[in-house]
């Protein structure tokens, strides 16, 4: 019997599997796809976030010229931003798994059963795998993770192109975090939920451009995002000449937190770890995998008398302590506000937000502020914001009051 069975081999699965294996635990991996199969999606992260972990060698690209547009003048961010070398990131975790003796089993988890001191996962092929604890990392629709139902799920959606263009779609050597300019849209189109350009120069005349909806319920269709991207490029006199890769991105931003008393532990999207106000997650995987692994190792090492349910509860609390739960609800509260803002309010909000001390907006986006620091940053934003943003923040609609009280009442 294994100490832990990790289901899934995406970034979340490899991150927690590597941390568990490095702690000397007997870990089995179960994945429906080859864990060594190359990842396709791009993953970005702020430079200091990776530097603080001593993992800057995992960057494939890094930009010091980082800007956003919430009007005609660029906002200089004064922080560098990077794109992971996907192969390097994947190999980093796979090497740690191998060093810890982890073995991968190809197969799809089909059923799970629990007794007092272990869980048994049955694969679609009928194989049974037993472990003291199961960690499900199979994403936002993880079959073994229970969470409250919600009819108000907001999705971040994006359509992007890596390729070559008739002329640079952005300045050479530049990274654009958000370009909310909408001069390429008709007045009627501007009444629809706003989208922004996320773009970067990858070198050798290759650029990545992506039209992104920060969050919308229901999700903005890919066809509309693609149309808007081509409209944006055409307005700037840019045509697509070579498409090397098309990227489609869709994930929920505000999934309810899982049931923290269940006997299966989640990680990554399965554990609602997407930053509700920004969509970032890979930095959180790197920072929080050790927290979960430590909690699991402590539960296994402290006493063999811990039941499966008790071990899972200890693990969940290691991943979601009270302060993180409270911050999560505050971020969800903020997301509700952003989705209600008009285009003008949204631009005014972001102009104010990125006018905060850079440690505050950076800490907000990376979820590295303490709870008191987060509240201080939000109060400062309210004090400095123009009246239309203040009014939007004060006006309470929909789920906003519920989320506010959940943040206060979290235990």
From Swiss-Prot:
Residues at which NAD(+) binds: 4-32
The enzyme's E.C. designation: 5.5.1.19
Entry keywords, A to Z: Carotenoid biosynthesis, FAD, Flavoprotein, Isomerase, NAD, NADP
Cofactor list: FAD
Protein name per the record: Lycopene beta cyclase
GO MF entries: lycopene beta cyclase activity; oxidoreductase activity, acting on paired donors, with incorporation or reduction of molecular oxygen
Gene behind the chain: crtL
Similarity-based family: Belongs to the lycopene cyclase family.
Record's function text: Catalyzes the double cyclization reaction which converts lycopene to beta-carotene. It also converts neurosporene to the monocyclic beta-zeacarotene but does not cyclize zeta-carotene.
One Pfam family here: Lycopene_cycl
PANTHER family the UniProt entry points to: OS02G0190600 PROTEIN, PTHR39757
Lineage: Bacteria, Bacillati, Cyanobacteriota, Cyanophyceae, Synechococcales
């Amino acid at each position: 019997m294994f100490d832990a069975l990790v289901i899934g081999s995406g970034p979340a699965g490899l991150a927690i599997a590597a941390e568990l294996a490095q702690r000397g635990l007997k870990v089995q991996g179960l994945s429906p796809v080859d864990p060594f199969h190359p990842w396709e999606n791009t993953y970005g992260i702020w430079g200091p976030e990776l530097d603080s972990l001593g993992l800057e060698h995992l960057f494939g690209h890094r930009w010091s010229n980082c800007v956003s547009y919430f009007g005609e003048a660029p906002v200089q961010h004064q922080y560098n931003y990077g794109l992971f070398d996907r192969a390097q990131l994947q190999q980093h975790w796979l090497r740690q798994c191998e060093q810890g003796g982890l073995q991968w089993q190809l197969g799809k988890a089909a059923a799970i059963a629990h007794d007092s001191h272990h869980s048994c996962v049955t694969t679609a092929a009928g194989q049974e795998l037993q472990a003291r604890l199961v960690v499900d990392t199979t994403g936002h629709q993880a079959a073994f993770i229970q969470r409250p139902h919600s009819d108000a799920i907001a999705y971040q959606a994006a359509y992007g192109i890596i390729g070559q263009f008739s002329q640079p779609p952005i300045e050479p050597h530049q990274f654009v975090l958000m370009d909310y300019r909408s001069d390429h849209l008709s007045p009627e189109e501007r009444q629809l939920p706003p989208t922004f350009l996320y773009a970067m120069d990858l070198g050798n005349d290759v650029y990545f451009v992506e039209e992104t909806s920060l969050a919308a319920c229901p999700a903005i269709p890919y066809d509309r995002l693609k149309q808007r991207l081509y409209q944006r490029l055409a307005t700037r006199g840019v045509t697509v000449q070579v498409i090397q890769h098309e990227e489609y991105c869709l994930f929920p931003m505000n999934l309810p937190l899982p049931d923290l008393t269940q006997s299966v532990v989640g990680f990554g999207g399965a554990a609602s770890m997407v930053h509700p106000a920004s969509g970032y997650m890979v930095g959180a995987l790197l920072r929080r995998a050790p927290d979960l692994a430590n909690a699991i190792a402590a539960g296994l090492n402290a006493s063999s008398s811990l039941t499966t349910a008790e071990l899972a509860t200890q693990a969940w609390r290691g991943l979601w302590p009270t302060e993180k739960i409270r911050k999560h609800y505050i971020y969800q509260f903020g997301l509700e506000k952003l989705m209600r803002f008009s285009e003008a309010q949204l631009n005014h909000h972001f102009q104010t937000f990125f006018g905060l001390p850079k440690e505050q907006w950076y800490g907000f986006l990376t979820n590295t502020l303490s709870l008191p620091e987060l509240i201080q940053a939000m109060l400062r934003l309210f004090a400095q914001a123009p009246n239309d943003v203040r009014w939007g923040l004060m006006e309470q609609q929909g789920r906003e009051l519920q989320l506010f009280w959940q943040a206060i009442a979290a235990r």
